[in-house]
Swiss-Prot record:
Name used for this protein in its record: DNA-directed RNA polymerase subunit alpha
Lineage top rank: taxon: Bacteria
TM region(s), chain numbering: none
Region annotation (Alpha N-terminal domain (alpha-NTD)) ranges: 1-231
Catalytic activity: RNA(n) + a ribonucleoside 5'-triphosphate = RNA(n+1) + diphosphate
Record remark on domains: The N-terminal domain is essential for RNAP assembly and basal transcription, whereas the C-terminal domain is involved in interaction with transcriptional regulators and with upstream promoter elements.
EC number: 2.7.7.6
Gene Ontology MF term list: DNA binding; DNA-directed RNA polymerase activity; protein dimerization activity
One matching Pfam family: RNA_pol_A_bac
Organism ancestry: Bacteria, Pseudomonadati, Pseudomonadota, Betaproteobacteria, Burkholderiales
Length: 326
């Protein structure tokens, strides 16, 4: 009996217009069309990297509920129009661009001043309409991101966004505008119980539908590879061991390694201080109460410990460690 699962042998891409395509994949075992189609759709909508305006500064505007003399749109509508501009950045994660225009006419995305490594996919997109004597002067910050990030999330986490006049925008970074899928019947030789996956993908032009589905598949493979390799699994004993505080090896060495005078060493052993870890937990007052250990011996101990980066009165957790012999 054949136990190997079928893999799709046919992957066809049918363009349906600008940045819009239908991708057909077949054959799949029954049920795999919905399993993979739903997973790919969710990744396409949530996890694709894109670019969006995130902050705007407009000359003469303090907040988004203002109006601008000579501009037909109020600031709220102006910002909504600005969100429709599709930016694409090359070799950088963020950029600040300028838009300056005066005089009667239409302001479009093509009026934005761009560096050489930034492009606008829809330069004809209308941003505003200026009346006679109108003037628009804007600074627009564009960033790379993933998914949807509300402006209030970034506003409270970024000190720079608290500057008066700087308007923080809700940012929709996803370059994928619409995704739908359907599962149809497929046939291979005598088998008629197979699935055909048909995906309808529309992007904003930053990436093509074909590249979008490639990237989403890579993300799924990368996420599932953890389960395939069983990475990150460990026994309870290993987990407990990894969480246990690590003890500096020098603390496990006997006090004899400090090469103290015989008098000082004998005084310490008389107080059951056998290891350097035992010694550093004692305070000066505690050691001065030790019979036959005076101020001179105490100073000697402090100097020797200091040469090793240690002091008296230190706190150690889980001391003594298990298995340490006295």
């Amino acid at each position: 009996m054949q136990t190997a699962l079928l893999k799709p042998k046919i992957i066809a891409v049918e363009p349906l217009g600008d940045h819009h395509a239908k991708v057909v994949m077949e054959p799949f075992e029954r049920g795999y069309g919905h399993t993979l189609g739903n997973a790919l759709r969710r990744v396409l909508l949530s996890s694709m990297v894109g670019y969006a305006p995130t902050e705007v500064t407009i000359a003469g505007v303090v907040h988004e509920y203002s109006t601008i003399d000579g501009v037909q749109e109020d600031v709220v509508n102006l910002l909504l129009n600005l969100k429709g501009v599709v930016f694409k950045l090359h070799n950088r994660d963020e950029v600040t661009v300028s838009l300056r225009k005066d005089g009667e006419g239409v302001v479009t995305a093509a009026d934005i001043e761009l560096p050489h490594d930034v492009e606008i996919i829809n330069p004809g997109h209308v941003i505003a309409h200026l009346s006679a004597g109108g003037k628009l002067d804007m600074q627009i910050k564009v960033e790379q991101g993933r998914g949807y990030v509300p402006g209030n999330v970034r506003k409270f986490g970024d000190e720079a966004s608290k500057v008066i006049g700087r308007i923080v925008l809700d940012a929709s970074f996803s370059p994928v505008r619409r995704v739908s899928y359907a599962v149809e019947s497929a046939r291979v030789e005598q088998r008629t119980d197979l699935d055909k996956l048909v995906m309808n993908i529309e992007t904003d032009g930053v990436i093509s539908p074909e590249e979008a589905i490639r990237q989403s598949a890579r993300i799924l493979v990368d996420q599932l590879s953890v389960f395939a390799a069983l990475e990150g699994t460990e026994s309870a004993a290993e987990a407990a061991s990894s969480r246990a505080p690590q003890i500096d090896p020098i603390l496990l060495r006997p006090v004899d390694d400090l090469e103290l005078t015989v008098r000082s060493a004998n005084c310490l052993k008389a107080e059951n201080i056998y290891y350097i870890g035992d010694l550093i937990q004692r305070t000066e007052n505690e050691l001065l109460k030790t019979p036959n250990l005076g101020r001179k011996s105490l100073n000697e101990i402090k100097e020797v410990l200091a040469s090793r980066g240690l002091t008296l009165g230190m706190k150690l957790e889980n001391w003594p460690p298990a298995g340490l012999e006295k």
